[in-house]
């Protein structure tokens, strides 16, 4: 979730099998059973459920009886059963989840002792429960985005896409958006010049089109430990978005590489900017420089708080603040062919209760009741109107706006660059262990 600075011949045999009404053997997906090196288990093939296309099969002349023909017809009309998504815990009954990608810290002269220090390793083991929460969330994230990447197609409504992703998070986490585990923040599905913070409200009719470039920003939390990771999807076959996608992905990896204990935030931003702005995008004979969106940042993450104080710039901004041991950061970059600066525009869908507002009194009885619903279901985690409606809330907009005006709830409207421009995003969550950093959300896809 974006941090905002103020100011992705067998046919004949098959035919005979059908005639005899013999079930075809089902091949097991090895990934479902054991996953891959990054914990990318593909146990979510339930979205590949299609009716068998028997009309195009080659068949030999048959002397089957009428009853045989009837059986064949019934067989033909059968649909494959959908696999039900089950909680991730069933795959890891001992509660030990796949680790992310480990990386050495930069500043070798300062941090080389961390790799071999037994004391640092001991300190790391003391926080094992925390790391396992992040790894569980990251494994859910990988499975959910695998399902999204294999299922999302042009022609789907944004509501359909959001429900696909969010229901998968709920099912894999085994929770329906509770404070124990589930959705970490509203699913971002921002298109084209919209850079971040768009998710559909109920009744939104927006449809994904073939030429759209869509940022998919998914949050998963376990016990308040939020995994924040995003990718960009395109469906255009002429490759026009390849350059901006490559620029942003490479800039994000540069930010991850440069991050570490005692590293200054300005230095990370400068490295990101150098990579991002070395790219150009061509469209219709015109060349557009790819710019960092300078008022969007990465950010550190605290328990139940997605933006926790420190911002990781994607340009050199002079911030001499250092990253510290034990912190968690979302390293994200945004590239644009527009102005490289975003402004709020459009109907708001994202909200979050502010921290430290216990002393603020809701202005009405209805807003007080609404605030209780927010506290019980989301705490300080971000949420959207659709999630509020799942709790049973109706006719809440006036009360919600009262909470916003009184500073109890913060609103995060969509943020956009100039119309007609294109924006892209990639993001990973990193954990600053005492001895190494872990890119916990890393997968085979990005």
From Swiss-Prot:
InterPro entries: Creatinase/aminopeptidase-like, Met_Aminopeptidase_Type2, Pept_M24, Pept_M24_MAP, Pept_M24A_MAP2, Pept_M24A_MAP2_BS, WH-like_DNA-bd_sf, WH_DNA-bd_sf. Its EC number is 3.4.11.18. The keyword GTP-binding does not apply. Its cofactor is Co(2+); Zn(2+); Mn(2+); Fe(2+). A divalent metal cation 1 binds at residues 217, 228, 427. It catalyses: Release of N-terminal amino acids, preferentially methionine, from peptides and arylamides. It is found in: Cytoplasm. Residues 73-85 have a biased composition (Basic residues). This is Methionine aminopeptidase 2.
